[in-house]
Amino acid sequence: MAETKEFKTLYNLFIDSYLQKLAQHSIPTNVTCAIHIGEVIGQFKNCALRITNKCMSNSRLSFTLMVESFIEVISLLPEKDRRAIAEEIGIDLDDVPSAVSKLEKNCNAYAEVNNIIDIQKLDIGECSAPPGQHMLLQIVNTGSAEANCGLQTIVKSLNKIYVPPIIENRLPYYDPWFLVGVAIILVIFTVAICSIRRNLALKYRYGTFLYV
């Protein structure tokens, strides 16, 4: 898989931004993880999985940083698509990132109903790349069941939108005409990743990696 070309989606840009924001805050991230990701399931093809522990004691901050990263990345999309994805996920683009979003409320309820104490299972949907290419899917465990739930929801939406190298190499440049070009290219390639599918029940189990 190391010899193939990497196939990137908006989720890759999102997770890079999220990791940068986590690193910028002088809050201990080496605390013992209260929550571990036990399994990652979904539809996988040519997909490499990486689990990164960035456990924080402040679950609210981790959720806020996640929303900030999401808003920044989807700014590359046309407004109609941007708002449609945000609504699907449960984030109000008119609110400040620190506001408690519908997504966060849903994830709080999810964690409470499922009584997640130690091990959490994530369903990330689809992770597929064309032949001769691979996708690197990074899952960041912040040690919060609520934040991990939010990440699960975001990856399902953003991992469907392919990012051509011309866009990746010029980020973060936000000239209006550039954004128009970005929007057109993104729309053209949105369905590229959705055309290649294969079902796999389990991709990762705590302490074990399976590559497809």
From Swiss-Prot:
GO terms for cellular component: membrane; viral envelope; virion membrane. Residues 1-175 are virion surface. The chain crosses the membrane at residues 176-196. Its main location: virion. Residues 197-212 are intravirion. Disulfide bonds join 33-55, 47-127, 107-149. It is a single-pass membrane protein. Keywords: Disulfide bond, Late protein, Membrane, Transmembrane, Transmembrane helix, Viral envelope protein, Virion. Disulfid bonds are oxidized in the cytoplasm by OPG088 protein. Unglycosylated because produced in viral factories instead of the classic ER -Golgi route. Belongs to the orthopoxvirus OPG053 family. Component of the entry fusion complex (EFC) composed of OPG053, OPG076, OPG086, OPG094, OPG095, OPG099, OPG107, OPG143, OPG104, OPG147 and OPG155. Except for OPG095 and OPG052, each of the EFC proteins is required for assembly or stability of the complex. This is EFC-associated protein OPG053. It comes from Vaccinia virus (strain Copenhagen). The gene is OPG053.
